[in-house]
């Protein structure tokens, strides 16, 4: 299994299970509830006390971060069943509250 060639930043999180126990069959997209860079998101996920992660993150400028290798299960959706089957992606918001909009650049990177 390989990771995306779109990755521009890597900060691997300890918050994962290796290896995932199901083949990838879906994508789960979640918004960050903030306008974080891929580096800032990676710093959050590297903390073991956070107990959260995602395979990838996309910031408002379209940069892509890798936090959990695709061969491993991230802790993204609070559902082990889902996370074992999904590539999980956190996407930065370019405005806070309301509709939690994401930038066109980030959306198109998806």
How would you label these PLM feature ranges?
Residues 2-109:
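Active-site-adjacent loop/helix surface patches within enzyme catalytic domains
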């Amino acid at each position: 299994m390989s990771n995306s060639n779109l990755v521009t930043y890597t900060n691997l999180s300890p918050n994962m299970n290796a290896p995932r126990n199901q083949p990838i069959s879906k994508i789960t997209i979640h918004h960050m509830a903030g306008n974080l860079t891929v580096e800032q998101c990676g710093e959050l996920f590297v903390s073991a006390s956070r107990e959260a992660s995602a395979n990838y993150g996309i910031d408002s400028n379209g940069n892509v971060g890798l936090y959990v290798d695709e061969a491993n299960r991230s802790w993204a959706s609070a559902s082990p069943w889902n996370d074992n089957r999904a590539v999980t992606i956190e996407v930065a918001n370019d405005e806070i509250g309301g509709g939690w909009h994401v930038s066109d650049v980030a959306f198109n990177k998806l």
